[in-house]
Each structure stands twice: as structure tokens, then as C-alpha cells.
Amino acid sequence: MSCIFCKIVKGDIPCVKLAETALSLAFLDIAPTSKGHALVIPKEHAAKMHELSDESCADILPLVKKVTKAIGPENYNVLQNNGRIAHQFVDHVHFHIIPKPNEEYGLGVGWPSYPISPEEIKALGEEISSKIK
């Protein structure tokens, strides 16, 4: 097993644990972008969010909420990346809780606008909603 997060779940690699459920684990990031930067991971290994079981999905977000409240930031980002070009560097689903105390620390995000017409948005919405089961 080469997944660093699976090794943390097993206890093979230490972490500064913040909280744990039967299905999820929260701990401090060892290379934080701000004070209190934490990770919440499912104990189940899944590389991308859409591969995660419904049980793990249902378990993890309440833990993200509890950890965020405990960290106590007024401003923060909750980030979950899937795939290399989306900036995922560990192939195990994980949520970053990143406090944003000021302009210097925390996550800086650019948000480029995608050119799409209202008609294209409507057609895309219909296409996507038809695939949701």
C-alpha cells in the first residue's frame, strides 16, 4: 500500500489527530497554508469523490463541519480536488479546511469566467440532470 493517507489511517504514519468517526479521520496538515489548516479524509480508499461510497460521503461532511467550527475561523475555504490538473496531489479523497485570516495566509483563488450563453446553460443543465439517478 503506497497511499500516504491509508498509512495514516492504519497508524503507520503519525498525525496530529483532531477527530475521528468510524469512517472518517481529521488531522492537521503538515504543510499548512494558514494556522489551523486541517484535512478530513475518509478511511475508505477512493482516489476521487465520485468513487467514494455513499456511506463515507454521508459521514465525512458532518465531520468537516465539526472540525471547521472547532478551528473557529471567521473566513475559510473548504476545498476538495479531483485529478492532477485540478491540483489533487494525493490520490485519496480529502477535504482541506483552510482558515483565511488575512490576504497573506490561507488559500488564494482565481475564478476565471467561462464563456457560455443562457441557452447553453439551460441545455447543459438538462443534459446533466437527465444523468442523475
Curated annotation (Swiss-Prot):
Pfam families: HIT. SUPFAM superfamilies: HIT-like (SSF54197). GO terms for biological process: nucleotide metabolic process. Its main location: nucleus. Belongs to the HINT family. It comes from the Eukaryota. It catalyses: adenosine 5'-phosphoramidate + H2O = AMP + NH4(+). This is Adenosine 5'-monophosphoramidase hnt1. Keywords: Hydrolase, Magnesium, Nucleotide-binding, Nucleus. GO terms for cellular component: cytosol; nucleus. PANTHER family: ADENOSINE 5'-MONOPHOSPHORAMIDASE HNT1, HIT FAMILY PROTEIN 1. The gene is hnt1. AMP binds at residues 29-30, 81, 87-89, 94-96. Homodimer. It is an enzyme of class 3 (hydrolase). Hydrolyzes adenosine 5'-monophosphoramidate substrates such as AMP-morpholidate, AMP-N-alanine methyl ester, AMP-alpha-acetyl lysine methyl ester and AMP-NH2. The active site is at 94 (tele-amp-histidine intermediate). GO terms for molecular function: adenosine 5'-monophosphoramidase activity; nucleotide binding. InterPro entries: HINT, Histidine_triad_CS, Histidine_triad_HIT, HIT-like, HIT-like_sf. Residues 4-107 form the HIT domain. CDD domains: HINT_subgroup (cd01277). A motif (Histidine triad motif) lies at residues 92-96. Its cofactor is Mg(2+). Its EC number is 3.-.-.-.
